[in-house]
Amino acid sequence: MDEAEVIRLIRALPGVVVVTAGPDTAAPEVAWGDSFAFYDPDDAGEAARRFPFATVVTKDYPGFDTESRLGRPGVFRLNLPAGRERFTRLFGFPPADLGDRRAEFAFDALDRLVPHPVYGRQGWVSVVAPGPATEREVRELLAHAHERARQRYERRGGAAADDRDDASW
């Protein structure tokens, strides 16, 4: 799967808005070119888009997130929140234990599901250059993350219940 295909897959989910950061968004310049998927069935805009349920990152963030080596041609990373329970089923240990288990993972491996190099302790997972080896799992995790985002949205009473001014970035 290439980046455009992954974004099309995400956009096909009901109630989803995908924002690609750029000069016309509130995103910091370092995030320009990266895409963020939000469950926003009312298309209420930035106020409703606090936390993405999926991100597609196209470059390393120097000094913060470089372990995936995203500077390689055509390489990007899909990030998804699996949650503690699913993360534990996937990797055999809870997200809180990732600090002690980091050496077990090649965060720059292509087409392999790994804990997110920065947000793994919060239950996020990632795949650098998803392809045939991870496609089924990516689709399942994407559906899982989308459903969790939908449930969170419903619990909060939809976009109207969330009137804070802070941006989702």
Language model: regions and residue ranges:
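Charge-dense, helix-prone N-terminal extensions
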Residues: 1-169
